[in-house]
Amino acid sequence: MIEEVVVEGQVYQLVENYKSGFDKKVFTERYSDILAKYDFIVGDWGYDQLRLKGFFDDQNPKATFDTKVAAIDDYLLEYCNFGCAYFIVKRIVK
């Protein structure tokens, strides 16, 4: 079964969970309403802290080069600790 989480009325579906980085409780605690505008959220762990970063679908008119979902791999390589646990959730519009 695909894991979903509801935060502040937004439904998110877990699409990647590298090294078991997804923790529903911590994600819910760290979530900020500013993230609701993004189509995807990446959560990465460093120094026992969860950092969240939003990305838009590549076709979203709000997307810039650095905020497109296609840039997630670059983000993980450049801004995250090497080999860190991370996850990606996708906003589901119902």
Model-derived features: positions:
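N-terminal interaction modules that seed assembly of large macromolecular complexes
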Residues: 36, 43-60
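Helix-rich interaction surfaces within compact, conserved domain-sized segments
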Residues: 64-94
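Compositionally biased, intrinsically disordered or flexible polar/acidic segments
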Residues: 9-18, 60-63, 86, 92-93
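N-terminal leader/targeting segments and the first structural element of proteins
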Residues: 1-46
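Ordered hydrophobic segments in well-structured contexts
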Residues: 13, 41-42, 51-53, 85-90
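Acidic, Ser/Thr- and Gly-enriched intrinsically disordered low-complexity segments
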Residues: 30-31, 35, 40, 60, ...
